[in-house]
Regions:
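Expand to "…catalyze enediolate/carbanion chemistry for C-C bond making/breaking, isomerization
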Residues: 210-213, 221, 225-232
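Conserved N-terminal glycine/acidic-rich loop preference
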Residues: 218
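Conserved alpha/beta-domain cores
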Residues: 1-206, 214, 226
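Short, Lys/Arg-enriched, disordered terminal segments
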Residues: 1-2, 232-234
């Protein structure tokens, strides 16, 4: 078993244990392997180990990887864009990715809707919440969610699937859980209004257990699977 396969197995075990501890089924939680800055060869190892969902933060890098595996004839992969999205890059996301986690304004949602090719299924989208109110992070306030969700739900080439957040780092589990719980409450409320909503993208390596206990359905894990990132190649 190679390192990536071994790491994936360990992460899956941690997800399973965290779910079991809070009375949830491990099948309720999707593992999104964050492959930004990692070569296609590393992703291929993860694919060989059964991983199918991959998250990319940089548009062109992600598109290059998507095309690479399409040209190889690899099917069944699911590509998630999880980085900040600029208007001038929206077409590439609309044309190539399956998901976008970082909807934080109607203008970008409208562009994605208009640019999504008719022959593709609707683009799955999550609204990003700036749950820790950090100036350095994208996302809307929870108070703005109702208005943006209603507008996004009307766009026919998008499918509103739920919420995403990147909480500020917290070392204490109790504080991690409190923040995650705020997201879970907003997610539950959104689910009652929109039948397509089923995804809460919340939790990374350091706060995964708290996120799962609070109700996350998707955790985003990178370094614990692929090792430290090399940004010099970006």
């Amino acid at each position: 078993m190679n390192d990536i396969a071994h790491n994936l197995a360990q992460v899956r075990d941690k997800i399973s244990a965290a779910a079991t501890r809070c009375g949830r089924s491990p099948e309720e939680i999707t593992l999104l392997a964050v492959s930004k800055t990692k070569p296609a060869s590393a992703i291929a190892e993860a694919i060989d180990a059964g991983q199918r969902q991959f998250g990319e933060n940089y548009v062109q890098e992600g598109v290059d990887k998507i095309r690479h595996f399409q040209e190889l004839g690899v099917t069944g992969l699911e590509w998630h864009f999880i980085g900040p999205l600029q208007s001038n890059k929206s077409r590439l996301v609309a044309e190539h990715f399956d998901w976008c986690h970082t909807i934080d304004r109607l203008r970008i949602a409208t562009r994605l809707n208009d640019q999504r090719p008719a022959e593709l299924p609707p683009l799955n989208v999550l609204i990003q919440i700036n749950i820790s109110d950090e100036n350095s992070k994208s996302g809307i306030q929870l108070a703005e969610l109702g208005e943006l969700a209603a507008a996004v739900a009307e766009l026919p080439r998008l499918r509103l699937r739920g919420l995403m957040a990147i909480p500020a780092p917290e070392s204490e589990y109790v504080r991690q859980f409190a923040v995650a719980r705020q997201m879970a409450v907003a997610f539950a409320r959104l689910k009652t209004r929109y039948p397509t909503v089923d995804t809460l993208s919340l939790g990374m390596s350091d706060d995964m257990e708290a996120a799962i206990a609070a109700g996350s359905t998707m955790v985003r894990i990178g370094t614990a699977i692929f090792g430290a990132r090399d940004y010099s190649k970006k």
